[in-house]
Regions:
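Intrinsically disordered, Lys/Arg-rich low-complexity segments
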Residues: 1-22
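His-enriched metal-coordination microenvironments in redox/metal-binding proteins
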Residues: 26-32
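Short, intrinsically disordered low-complexity segments
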Residues: 26, 39-109
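Short acidic DE-rich linear segments
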Residues: 134-136
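Intrinsic structural disorder/low-complexity segments
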Residues: 16-18, 26, 125
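Sequence/structural signature of long amphipathic alpha-helices
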Residues: 35-36
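Short, compact, well-ordered microdomains
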Residues: 98-132
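Intrinsically disordered/low-complexity terminal segments and short unstructured peptides
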Residues: 4-6, 15, 31, 68, ...
């Protein structure tokens, strides 16, 4: 008697069970906040305030953009004044003496590290961090 190889297709259940046993990667949740600064500053000045990250920072001075490599993804600071060009925003910025606005984008899994970075920046530059709907 010859040995026959089982040529039957695996059942859909078997394939699904195998997939569910594999490690599932978490879905990235990118967050955006805004850093409102009451003084003129540049992205290079901000980078200098983060000595522990000097080897993890990339700067694009012409775009006023800084990218920091964190544990799960990157944290990006990007000048965002044009996001707040309407007169209501401008009145708010004038009343609160806001001179510079950066959009901050990061992975939710890096939130604790982001809080430490923002705390360091705020200690030197003051200002506040908020979501877009919290600004006015």
């Amino acid at each position: 008697m010859k040995n026959k190889t089982n040529t039957k297709k695996k059942s859909a259940h078997h394939q699904t069970a195998k997939k569910s046993a594999e490690q599932v990667k978490p879905v990235k949740k990118m967050l955006t906040e805004y850093y409102l600064i009451p003084q003129e500053t540049s992205i290079s000045q901000m980078a200098e305030l983060l000595p522990d990250y000097q080897e993890k920072i990339e700067l694009w001075l012409e775009m006023d953009l800084m990218e920091l490599t964190l544990t799960h993804d990157t944290m990006v600071f990007e000048e965002a004044a044009e996001d707040f060009a309407n007169s209501e925003d401008q009145v708010y910025f004038a009343e609160h003496k806001i001179k510079k606005v950066y959009a901050i984008t990061y992975d939710a899994l890096d939130a604790e590290e982001v809080r430490q970075i923002l705390s360091t920046l705020q200690a030197a530059l003051q200002g506040r961090v908020c979501e877009e709907d919290e600004i006015l």
